[in-house]
């Protein structure tokens, strides 16, 4: 029934590649590359074909098959599967390359570093120590041909064909019969009459010396060449000479050889070896030791081999995060190693971990992720961003830690191109509205405006029309000077998104109000922006046919490609905002925008004007000092231009307490003295007045000037609440009620929404409601007091204590 027989080679779950076999070690085995049929993973397959009349070689091959199958050690070639038939033997191992082939390929690419060679030899000596000291086995075949290298650059000891027991069980060493291998035998084996006392490891340590010579000098031509160390490093020569000494008694045990080489200043005493040893024992290390190791690992990765980082360090980092609770310290080395991966490998190994990290509640990890988002954002697809990352990132907008809130705002610059229409035009802008209106940190309000200016091109046309003008108008009324500058620059950066009607009726009136701003930097930018808008209007006035061309982007769909114009603005503007506002936080805290302290509000006619606060005295010699510091700050701002991601955003968290501690002093003075220094950024050329807008003067300039006016009295309506375009009067008691922006019948808007009206209406309306309630209470109190006084007057005659005379 021969047709029922099955070919075991055909059913073997591994197959040999059709490529020519690699140059394997001298001996019975031929090394092939192969793969697993089920998964396609790469393996190495050692093949021995049984030949008639070669029974001795067949027995050697079968012994090697048995030894490799039963021996398990990290530094010995890893056995995966095997096949034994009457015609052949197959041994499947991890994918490896012969050491000779590996060294030749690396030499062509620039050669191996000494630290790589030290770790490779460390592994081979450790494998010999395991065989001799733990298993009582003599390898009997240590040479270049018996060493293999895996994909991580790890050296593995193979060539177990001629291994025998050190205790004498099963006879002596087998006969090799191969001249290429016999040249590595120690001299005492050639002299049969020699009675020199030797240790069980003496022969293998001699062969180890031959291996060391070959690693540094190439193939060993003859045994006498061992007398010349050649290129062997000086730190290893002393220990090498002990290995190739004629007296077998003085050859050290493999364990002692390792100890000698690991001594301070020794050949195997370096950062690379220490890192590998720690990774081998990382599972039994204490959490504090792991934290320290990962913190220091990032500094060393640049000097480590790329294959080692990809195939050994990366799996340990992923395991440490997945099961070891390593936390945020893993992120820096993880992203550093990720640079060595292809796009496909990054998607398979890094992205799943990153997505899981975003759901973490660890603040340190969230900040690190936001800070390093630029390194992995390109590998994230839109569905992953919208469903698994953005919902977790938005929690940062509501975090009590200012540093996390600001980093979250910053990350939107990278996430915006990948966000869906709903997440971008609704969810994100809802958070931006809350931050710009209510956040107590001036720099966060400022950078929210900056971020909105850059992502404006990604918004839909209807959202742009509804949001941008209101948002930037609100920013121009912020008590924090850099926020006002950001609002002006926001108008400039998004100039192509406004119709001519909006420019004339909405934007220019807002900008004109800033021409009398106390801060010179705000005034300067306002004048430049006004001139640009006026030149645009003038060109349309002279040639109305240009209107369609100028307004071509107003109703266009969101176009990420147009973000380049805003990118130049955001690049330097964000740098200026982050650097200068961080200085402000450290030295001059800003007040929280509140109902009681809103600077630069017009006082209604008829109310008494508050007395101006005295300006702080300035020494006569301060002008020269400020000029020098201006030049210094200008150099710093120029050097740090376009480095949004390099800014120290964490400074907000460090200085939050000082900001809050000094707010009470601001509120009690009513009009805070502003003191600061002037810093100028580099002047940049204007491309048709729109490509970029340099900041002339620091945002902390002008704190020496007093606030213009005090807050208006309670119940007073603000000028911003009147519609100066004219409307029918609805309240006879208020002569300006006819000019109100909102009819009284309209409901109040959601404070987190981006309504059609200007953003300042949110705060003004809140103050209006409170003022109305206070007025009603005062009116009720007045009527009660009048009733009591009338009752007292109605009583007649003198009154006694505790009684009243009856009529």
UniProtKB/Swiss-Prot annotation:
Disulfide bonds: none annotated. Keywords: Coiled coil, Cytoplasm, Cytoskeleton, ER-Golgi transport, Golgi apparatus, Phosphoprotein, Repeat, Transport. GO terms for biological process: inflammatory response; neuron development; protein localization; retrograde vesicle-mediated transport, Golgi to endoplasmic reticulum; spinal cord motor neuron differentiation. One of its GO terms (molecular function) is protein kinase activity. It comes from the Eukaryota. Residues 792-807 are annotated as: Interaction with COPB1. It is found in: Cytoplasm, Cytoskeleton, Microtubule organizing center, Centrosome; Cytoplasm; Endoplasmic reticulum-Golgi intermediate compartment; Golgi apparatus, cis-Golgi network. Residues 764-774, 781-794 have a biased composition (Basic and acidic residues). Residues 587-807 are annotated as: Disordered. GO terms for cellular component: centrosome; cis-Golgi network; COPI vesicle coat; cytoplasm; endoplasmic reticulum-Golgi intermediate compartment; Golgi apparatus. The keyword Secreted does not apply. Residues 644-656, 753-763 have a biased composition (Acidic residues). Residues 756-796 form a coiled coil. Its main location: cytoplasm. InterPro entries: ARM-like, ARM-type_fold, CIK-Related_Protein, Kinase-like_dom_sf, Prot_kinase_dom. Residues 14-314 form the Protein kinase domain. Residues 660-679 have a biased composition (Polar residues). PANTHER family: N-TERMINAL KINASE-LIKE PROTEIN, SCY1-RELATED S/T PROTEIN KINASE-LIKE. The protein kinase domain is predicted to be catalytically inactive. Regulates COPI-mediated retrograde protein traffic at the interface between the Golgi apparatus and the endoplasmic reticulum. Involved in the maintenance of the Golgi apparatus morphology. Belongs to the protein kinase superfamily. Homooligomer. Interacts with GORAB. Interacts with COPA, COPB1 and COPB2. Interacts with AP2B1. This is N-terminal kinase-like protein. The gene is Scyl1.
